[in-house]
Amino acid sequence: MKAKKYYGQNFISDLNLINKIVDVLDQNKDQLIIEIGPGKGALTKELVKRFDKVVVIEIDQDMVEILKTKFNHSNLEIIQADVLEIDLKQLISKYDYKNISIISNTPYYITSEILFKTLQISDLLTKAVFMLQKEVALRICSNKNENNYNNLSIACQFYSQRNFEFVVNKKMFYPIPKVDSAIISLTFNNIYKKQINDDKKFIEFVRTLFNNKRKTILNNLNNIIQNKNKALEYLKMLNISSNLRPEQLDIDEYIKLFNLIYISNF
């Protein structure tokens, strides 16, 4: 069956690559694995061997029929749905597992949506493993003063330890995409989250500050609080130069700035 462009389908079949990807997951058998976009089940075949429960979410009816024909495993559940429309928290609540991980050969066109949907339930997850466009993977794992650094980098760092695992050459897929991919892993923790009383508000705060990367942090902050003098005072209190641009601040500085503005009585 041919891949469907409108679903962003690109398939893998190399067994060494499949094993290498699945190896990135924590190899604790007693866990729930949620696979997003299993396609023809290349990863699924290995997942059902290694883990107690695997739930796959696939939007394409044709792929679902292939999966149902290929697999007859008691530890596999196949759900036909658009993952962006599923309540993942409610889905997870159906299963009694302490260790829950997500794995996905992510369609390029909904990468950000899937990432942010995953981050929203990070407190329920142990780990996530994503195959992404290489450029996006580098962006997620970048740090301040690096070209790719943006609000997505900070959002992923806020919820997890980010790891750039390895590059996947585009020739490993069929049909062959235009660019290489890469595997990243997010190991979830509360190191930064416990410093903030409203994580969603913080993520939106950072996103707004990155709306115009060419502007200084002072001008972008002024767009939020609508008071340039007050914005300058906040930056001075934290010893942050008003001439810096958003990509020149690290996550600790963003957290301090957020808390100063929204928690303190200053």
UniProtKB/Swiss-Prot annotation:
Cellular compartment(s): Cytoplasm
Catalytic reaction equation(s): adenosine(1518)/adenosine(1519) in 16S rRNA + 4 S-adenosyl-L-methionine = N(6)-dimethyladenosine(1518)/N(6)-dimethyladenosine(1519) in 16S rRNA + 4 S-adenosyl-L-homocysteine + 4 H(+)
Pfam families the UniProt entry points to: RrnaAD
Entry binding sites for S-adenosyl-L-methionine: N10, I12, G37, E58, D82, N105
GO molecular function, one term: 16S rRNA (adenine(1518)-N(6)/adenine(1519)-N(6))-dimethyltransferase activity
EC number: 2.1.1.182
Keywords: Cytoplasm, Methyltransferase, RNA-binding, rRNA processing, S-adenosyl-L-methionine, Transferase
Signal peptide: none
GO cellular component, one term: cytosol
Enzyme class: transferase
Function of the molecule: Specifically dimethylates two adjacent adenosines (A1518 and A1519) in the loop of a conserved hairpin near the 3'-end of 16S rRNA in the 30S particle. May play a critical role in biogenesis of 30S subunits.
Classification via HAMAP family: 16SrRNA_methyltr_A (MF_00607)
Family the entry assigns: Belongs to the class I-like SAM-binding methyltransferase superfamily. rRNA adenine N(6)-methyltransferase family. RsmA subfamily.
Record-given protein name: Ribosomal RNA small subunit methyltransferase A
Organism: Mycoplasma capricolum subsp. capricolum (strain California kid / ATCC 27343 / NCTC 10154)
Encoding gene per record: rsmA
